[in-house]
Amino acid sequence: MAEKFYITTAIPYVNARPHVGFALEAIQADVVARFMRILGRDVWFLSGTDEHGAKISRAAQAAGKDVREFVDEHAELFKKLLAVLGISNDDFIRTSDENRHFPGAAALWRLISKNGDLVKKTYQGLYCVGHEAFVTEKDLVRGKCVDHNAEPERLEEENYFFRLSRYAGKIKRAIESGELKIIPETRRNEILTLIESG
């Protein structure tokens, strides 16, 4: 039986049309997937789009469109780009897909919740809409995000956090032993550092 090899592109936000960065990433992932197939691996190559978030809602509003209509149009552009580039992905999934994505996400949520792996906490900080992430003061220059030239919003929100600490040792051993391979090596080291930092 052939060794399994899983590869994915990032799932970009559909707040704008695809850009050269996504094309480059898709081509790079495709090269790796094709090479692994040549080596006889059982490859599963996934791509898709992330269709949830504040910047998507804001982009749809700025375009004067319903959010669903907006994400449908933009997701199709990402999918078409992969076809035009001849990318050999096995699947393309959208996070708004109620038939495919939702059931799997809901099942995972129920499982980790049942196992006590979710912790509900209030988090507050500086939120950069462009990054769809919280940032720190040290990430800012003169109070603004350097990538988006915008001041982050001060937010306080209740969120669920995954209790990674419960699995850190097992994950670290799997990575270090090579059972779980992360390519490139710099990303492997980044993940190990993240695990070690708690």
Set out the residue ranges of the language-model regions.
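N-terminal, positively charged nucleic-acid-binding surface of large information/translation enzymes
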Residues: 1-198
